[in-house]
Design a protein with these regions (language model features):
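Bacterial N-terminal signal peptides that target proteins for export
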Residues: 2-13
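C-terminal motif of bacterial Sec signal peptides marking the signal peptidase cleavage site
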Residues: 23-24
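Blade/loop signatures of beta-propeller domains
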Residues: 31-51, 147, 151
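A flexible loop/linker signature enriched in serine peptidases of the S9 family
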Residues: 58-61, 78-88, 103-108, 124-153, ...
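Residue-level detector of Asp-centered blade-edge/turn motifs that repeat once per structural unit
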Residues: 69-70, 115-117, 180-181, 224-225, ...
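Hydrophobic beta-strand positions that form the internal "hydrophobic ladder"
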Residues: 71-75, 121-122, 185-186, 229, ...
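Short loop/turn segments that connect beta-strands within beta-propeller blades
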Residues: 92-96, 157-161, 201-205, 265-269
């Protein structure tokens, strides 16, 4: 999934470490008791919703971490060093042991456990198109997100064995997550010529386009009962916005923008806009009962640097 790089952008400030907060793993059926070394000095004064906090990573850039179904592991992307590309890792939360589960080639993003049994993983990678680490984006037009056209979605065994492509179309395919019953995958694809949300079966069959509006649709997650989808979107409206969006898209890039939170039914019907501001709204996720959504936003910071949940 597209994420903000702290070393390449100073407009936004996000956490540079992965933290486990005792808000509970939203998708778990039963609470998982983990033995962790909590460092509650990391909790800022005035934070009333955090009970305990444990820092899990201490070097490099670590992003987009997601819990396994049993709540005992995390899958995430990371690299350590400016010249290296992100690869996918699984961490045992208690022991802090880390295992590389992607191929080590190309660049990767957007990993997720195969629910409901943790018997595999999915992630996006360019290794099938080109095993080399691609060059860093050109920021001469400002800060942009790169949509590497070699990105395809792969499934693999839990330890990364036997990776198999679920997509093979030209252009960007990434930002994939499973429904919690394991019956569907939702992802972002450029196959139609625009960045739209698609769903498919776990074996890659039954691909269905769910959105069809000019702009970026991405970062989607199913509700716990798999009946709803929540995602982030940007739809350019003015002639200038549309021209800028199309120009960058032709170069396999998009610019950070005022992303808004949307929901819809799992079949793509009943689309509803949840936020309506000029801020950046990220990472929407349903509560277990489906009645609330948690997300990250800089709506309360006039400078746009500070994100809160």
């Amino acid at each position: 999934m597209i994420s903000l790089n702290r070393k390449e952008i100073n407009k936004y400030v996000i956490f540079s470490f992965v933290a486990v907060l005792s808000l509970g793993c939203f998708h778990q059926r039963k609470p998982t008791k983990l033995k962790l070394d909590f460092n509650n000095s990391l909790i800022l004064s005035g934070e009333s919703h955090f009970k305990n906090m444990s820092q899990l990573t201490f070097s490099g850039e670590n992003a987009e971490a997601y819990f396994s179904a049993d709540g005992r592991k995390l899958i995430y992307q990371a690299h350590d060093g400016d010249s290296l590309c992100d690869q996918i890792y699984i961490m045992d939360i208690e022991s802090k042991s880390v295992e590389l589960v992607s191929t080590g080639a190309g660049v990767t993003t957007c990993s997720f456990f195969k629910y409901p049994n943790d018997n595999g993983i999915i992630y996006s990678s360019t290794h099938m198109d080109n095993p080399d680490c691609p060059p860093k984006p050109d920021f001469s037009r400002g800060y942009i997100w790169k949509l590497y056209p070699g990105f395809n979605i792969f499934e693999a065994g839990l330890g990364g064995s036997s990776p198999r492509p679920l997509t093979s179309s030209p252009g960007y395919d990434a930002e994939a997550t499973y429904s919690f019953d394991g019956k569907k995958i939702i992802y972002t694809s450029l196959v139609s010529g625009d960045l739209e949300l698609w769903s498919m079966n776990p074996d890659g069959s039954g691909k269905q386009q769910l959105t069809n509006r000019l702009g970026y649709d991405g970062g989607a997650f199913y509700s716990y009962d798999a009946s709803k989808i929540v995602w982030r979107a940007y739809y350019p409206e003015t002639e200038e916005e549309i021209a800028d969006y199309k120009s960058l898209l032709a170069e396999n890039s998009i610019r950070p923008m005022a992303l808004q939170i949307w929901t819809m039914n799992a079949d793509g019907t009943n689309k509803e806009q949840i936020t309506n501001n000029n801020s950046a709204n990220f990472g929407p996720f349903y509560f277990p009962n489906g009645g609330k959504i948690i997300f990250s936003s800089n709506m309360h910071d006039p400078k746009g640097r500070d994100f809160d949940l």
